[in-house]
């Protein structure tokens, strides 16, 4: 019998039948019929947007759950949606009470902090779960227990930003915030200067008109290249347009946006600008399941009526939509775990809480799920999300389209995932250096770079041509060839411009820079390809590549005139001191030989060997003979005197060894002094320059050489800088050409790089390099500080170095006509001017010998005459006493004959005795 028939017949209705019907309605029917679970959503509306994206995501999630019965097979999820005006907390409270009266298991929304607080207080009083998906201002004494928040904790995001700043090693950071809540969200970064060496400048975006151009102009003037924007994605889209308008969308700027919807913005206009743009992404698009849900969302949104312009890509799911989707799923998972979940109607004015509310709240906090925003778990104490991942994404020009859908294709094409930040483990950058350098042409291909340079032979010169030349064709030189090779490797296009002031770059007393360095600092040029020296002070304001040429400071001076050796050049092989020492040694050896020969008994001999009993002995080594022995050995001629004793032979042998070394050294050195024309320079090193003031010296004004002497702490170089600074008008020159002309025309020495000296001396034989290198340094390609091109330029330079192209380019531009080398001069025939002094010495010796012979003759004659007169007088007296004079002539004659005989006998005796020396 049907139930309708039973009810239609009153006679059949009994008391037992009534109890059976009541049992069926209360117990059997609920178990067989599907259960309905109602949730409530309160969403704020704004002008021109009656339905916000969170409401759409809320409905999308409920529809998805009801279609897929695997999660809630016996339960149908329904919803009640209430719309309120923005900032209307009273209306939010009233609508929340209306929904609680209907019997909802959980309340979602609203978004604004004041409205959230009002709804949260009601849910906390009636013990109904409140689900939040927006950033919430932290409360010091937060006692709310009946809520969860899927939005990442503000403190965790602040730590993530700080970790990224430390990873990029930013020393100066500009923080631009939209409202006061931004300072709370970035408090970890704002407190960083007290713990890290980071300078932070804080600026606020103008409110109301959204015109940030004056602010951006100040940032551009202040060279603020690392900027963190804390703003909504709508404001970010507008700011990016103004950044492009201000010319700040270049590779030297790095912008970081804290909004989690940066990936959803339409950035096609900025992809090829070279700008560095980084942000966080909460959506886990690497999961294929997530990608498919995003594609379904996109298809539904594209079929819907167009929405007002927000800067987002059409159909792109935002983070707030994904969080709302995940929030609905978290409630569904908790309700699935709850058995016989009965939702009762609650009245706000009665303050009677929901009996199952605490249990259901705990089930929600214990739920775990891998949603659109990654793995979701909650802190049971405060209801905040924990252990979440933030993808670190960076804007790129092109990439691999790994996803199947159009939206996912865009995400992979425009954005590159370079790392992950986890709330527990911190930062993990996955974009390794190997990946960065695998294709070094990515960010330089087909990009036009402004190159600043300076006219300096042979690096950059005007090309000689009969036709008018334009652009880069006007120049030639080593640096132009280097630029061409770098362009071939990296694929960039370049525009060469001469530095307006014609200077390399130096810092004045006010800290201001000039020259090419200033061009790079002001970002008027991308590269400085010139003979720009890598120095410490320049490295602090610009970046350099690895050096493409190594060199040092040296002295350029006029080549001294050659001087002939001179007629007495045979004395030059030995210094005057050595000549004096040799003569003293000869005298000393002669005296020692004389003394030893007198002292030793073996140098005395009997002059009459036939008469062994003779007491007369002789010694050949008189003082004159000893000197003659020394001179003969020194002249390599020997003498008739030979030592007999061992002691005298030792003296003679040592003297012979000494003369052997001296004569050999003299002979070996004599040829160079007689055959090679000597170049005598008044200076041989920097020390010689510092010790004198007659020769003026200096360097190029505002160049690295001048800076070297200005900053040097070495006493010699300090003295040289004092000399140059005291004569700045004459010592310092404007450029190298002016300095070279001064070297040629005046008594001036130019301090400059050795490579430039090498080039100049190859083409002007009147100039030469004096001394060695004062220091060691290198030329590098300059870039603005933080430029992404530096590492790529360095890799290309190393490649050219390994291939030998740098050496070939140097040989090409440095090879000149060449000057004859001094060492390669052929020995010419010796003339009178070379060895004429020897003839003078010979003639002087002959003349001297003649005069000495005459002197000896006169001396001997006078000596003999005196002796004869003395003898005659003495023996005349003797004869006169022995034989008195008679008057007869016979007696006188006899007496004279006898006296003459006596005199002759006495002469013979004295002559014989004079032969023997005792």
UniProtKB/Swiss-Prot annotation:
Localization per record: Cell membrane; Postsynaptic cell membrane
Modification sites for Phosphoserine: 725
Transmembrane segments: 577-597, 654-674, 835-855
Signal peptide start-end: 1-30
GO molecular function: glutamate-gated calcium ion channel activity; kainate selective glutamate receptor activity
Recorded superkingdom: Eukaryota
Carbohydrate attachment residues: 68, 74, 276, 379, 428, 439, 446, 561, 766
Catalytic activity: Ca(2+)(in) = Ca(2+)(out)
Residues on Extracellular side: 31-576, 675-834
Residue numbers of Phosphothreonine PTMs: 761
Binding site for L-glutamate: 531, 533, 538, 704-705, 753
Disulfide bonding pattern of the chain: 765-819
Membrane topology: Multi-pass membrane protein
Cytoplasmic side: 598-653, 856-918
Keyword Disulfide bond annotated: yes
Cellular component GO terms, alphabetical: postsynaptic membrane
Note: The postsynaptic actions of Glu are mediated by a variety of receptors that are named according to their selective agonists. This receptor binds domoate > kainate > L-glutamate = quisqualate > CNQX = DNQX > AMPA > dihydrokainate > NMDA.
Similarity-based family: Belongs to the glutamate-gated ion channel (TC 1.A.10.1) family. GRIK1 subfamily.
PANTHER family in the record: IONOTROPIC GLUTAMATE RECEPTOR
Quaternary structure (record): Homotetramer or heterotetramer of pore-forming glutamate receptor subunits. Tetramers may be formed by the dimerization of dimers. Can form functional heteromeric receptors with GRIK4 and GRIK5. Interacts with KLHL17.
Function comment: Ionotropic glutamate receptor that functions as a cation-permeable ligand-gated ion channel, gated by L-glutamate and the glutamatergic agonist kainic acid. L-glutamate acts as an excitatory neurotransmitter at many synapses in the central nervous system. Binding of the excitatory neurotransmitter L-glutamate induces a conformation change, leading to the opening of the cation channel, and thereby converts the chemical signal to an electrical impulse. The receptor then desensitizes rapidly and enters a transient inactive state, characterized by the presence of bound agonist.
Full protein name: Glutamate receptor ionotropic, kainate 1
Record organism: Macaca fascicularis (Crab-eating macaque)
Name of the encoding gene: GRIK1
């Amino acid at each position: 019998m049907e139930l309708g028939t039973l009810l239609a017949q009153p006679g059949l209705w009994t008391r037992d039948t009534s109890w059976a019907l009541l049992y069926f309605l209360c117990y059997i029917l609920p178990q067989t019929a599907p259960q309905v679970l109602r949730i409530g959503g309160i969403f704020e509306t704004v002008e021109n947007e009656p339905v916000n994206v969170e409401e759409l995501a809320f409905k999308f999630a409920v529809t998805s759950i009801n279609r897929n019965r695997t999660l809630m097979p016996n339960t149908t999820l329904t919803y009640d949606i209430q719309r309120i005006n923005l900032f209307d907390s009273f209306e939010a409270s009233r609508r929340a009470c209306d929904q609680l009266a209907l019997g909802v298991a959980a309340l979602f929304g609203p978004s604004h902090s004041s409205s959230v607080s009002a709804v949260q207080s009601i849910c906390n009083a009636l013990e109904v779960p409140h689900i939040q998906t927006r950033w919430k201002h932290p409360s010091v004494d937060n006692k709310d227990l009946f809520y969860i928040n899927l939005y990442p904790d503000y403190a965790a995001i602040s730590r993530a930003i700080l970790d990224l700043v430390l990873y990029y090693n930013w020393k100066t950071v500009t923080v631009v915030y939209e409202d006061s809540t931004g300072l709370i969200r970035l408090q970890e970064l704002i407190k960083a200067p007290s713990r890290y060496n980071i300078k932070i400048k804080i600026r606020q975006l103008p409110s109301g008109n959204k015109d940030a151009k004056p602010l951006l102009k100040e940032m551009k003037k202040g060279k603020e290249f690392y900027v963190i924007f804390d703003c909504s994605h709508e404001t970010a889209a507008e700011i990016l347009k103004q950044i492009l308008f201000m010319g700040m969308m270049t590779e030297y700027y790095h912008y970081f946006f804290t909004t989690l919807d940066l990936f959803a913005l339409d950035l096609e206009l900025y992809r090829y600008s070279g700008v560095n743009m980084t942000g966080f992404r909460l959506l886990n698009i690497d999961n294929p399941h997530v990608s498919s849900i995003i594609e379904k969302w996109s298809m539904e949104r594209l079929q819907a009526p167009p929405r007002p312009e927000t800067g987002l890509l059409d159909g792109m799911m935002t983070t707030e939509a994904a969080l709302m989707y995940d929030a609905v799923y978290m409630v569904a998972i908790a309700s699935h775990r709850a058995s016989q979940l009965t939702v009762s109607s609650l009245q706000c004015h009665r303050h009677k809480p929901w009996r199952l509310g605490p249990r259901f709240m705990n089930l929600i906090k214990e739920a775990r799920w891998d949603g659109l925003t990654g793995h979701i778990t909650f802190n049971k104490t405060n209801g905040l999300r924990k252990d979440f991942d933030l993808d670190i994404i960076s804007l790129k020009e092109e990439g691999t389209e790994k996803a199947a859908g159009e939206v996912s294709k865009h995400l992979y094409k425009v954005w590159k995932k370079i790392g992950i930040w986890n709330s527990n483990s911190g930062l993990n950058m996955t974009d390794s250096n190997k990946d960065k350098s695998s294709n070094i042409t990515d960010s330089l291909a087909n990009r036009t770079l402004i190159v600043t340079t300076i006219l300096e032979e042979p690096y950059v010169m005007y090309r000689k041509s009969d036709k008018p030349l334009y652009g880069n064709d006007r120049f030639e030189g080593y640096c132009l060839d280097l630029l061409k090779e770098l362009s071939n490797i990296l694929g960039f296009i370049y525009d060469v411009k001469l530095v307006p002031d014609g200077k390399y770059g130096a810092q004045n007393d006010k800290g201001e820079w000039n020259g090419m360095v200033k061009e790079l600092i002001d970002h008027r040029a991308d590269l400085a390809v010139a003979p720009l020296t890598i120095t410490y002070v320049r490295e602090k304001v610009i970046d350099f590549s690895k050096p493409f040429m190594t060199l040092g400071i040296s002295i350029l001076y006029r080549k001294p005139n050659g001087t002939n050796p001179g007629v007495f050049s045979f004395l030059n092989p030995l210094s005057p001191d050595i000549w004096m020492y040799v003569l003293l040694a000869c005298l000393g050896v002669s005296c020692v030989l004389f003394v030893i020969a007198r002292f030793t008994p073996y140098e005395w001999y009997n002059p009459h060997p036939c008469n062994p009993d003779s007491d007369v002995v002789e010694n050949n080594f008189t003082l004159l003979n000893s000197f003659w022995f020394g001179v003969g050995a020194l002249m390599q001629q020997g003498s008739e005197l030979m030592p007999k004793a061992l002691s005298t032979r030792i003296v003679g042998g040592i003297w012979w060894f000494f003369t052997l070394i001296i004569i050999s050294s003299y002979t070996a050195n004599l040829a160079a002094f007689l055959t090679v024309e000597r170049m005598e320079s008044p200076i041989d090193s920097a020390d010689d320059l510092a010790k004198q003031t007659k020769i003026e010296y200096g360097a190029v004004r505002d160049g690295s050489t001048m800076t070297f002497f200005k900053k040097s702490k070495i006493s010699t170089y300090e003295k040289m800088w004092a000399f140059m600074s005291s004569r700045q008008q004459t010592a310092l020159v404007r450029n190298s050409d002016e300095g070279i002309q001064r070297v040629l025309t005046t008594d001036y020495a130019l301090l400059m790089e050795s490579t430039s000296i090498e080039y100049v001396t190859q083409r002007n034989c009147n100039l030469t390099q004096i001394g060695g290198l004062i220091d060691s340094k290198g030329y590098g390609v300059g870039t603005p500080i933080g430029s992404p091109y530096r590492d790529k330029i360095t890799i290309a330079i190393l490649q050219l170095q390994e291939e030998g192209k740098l050496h070939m380019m140097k040989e090409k531009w440095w090879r000149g006509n060449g000057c004859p080398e001094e060492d390669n001069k052929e020995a010419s025939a010796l003339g009178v001017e070379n060895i004429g002094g020897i003839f003078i010495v010979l003639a002087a010796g002959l003349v001297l010998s003649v005069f000495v012979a005459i002197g000896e003759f006169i001396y001997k004659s006078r000596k003999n005459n005196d002796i004869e007169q003395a003898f005659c007088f003495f023996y005349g007296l003797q004869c006169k006493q022995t034989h008195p004079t008679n008057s007869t002539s016979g007696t006188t004659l006899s007496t004279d004959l006898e006296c003459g005989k006596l005199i002759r006998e006495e002469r013979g005796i004295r002559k014989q005795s004079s032969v023997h020396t005792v």
